């Protein structure tokens, strides 16, 4: 299986997030950049229960020079949040992984009055500069 190591890492991370209550059902996702080819991103699939997944179910996406993304491998289509995850990675070369969660704790933080921490939605990433990630 191609990209086996990165797929296993993403699968282990999503299962730990589910176990700790950070992600419920299929809401949320984890994406990780490949260490050898930084245009390759492994991301959890869309609409699939995480608890029954295998490494080959993790989607592989290739980031293109024009800013688009192409699903190149995986049993299931990638999360609909691919544009948000890859845009963060494009703007922040130091970021190698993203975790998108709807956990109660993340929601509370996003509702706070900290001017340094701004909530980010997928449409914002496409049309608004992402200042802090």
For every predicted segment, state its role:
Residues 1-133:
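Glycine-rich flexible loops
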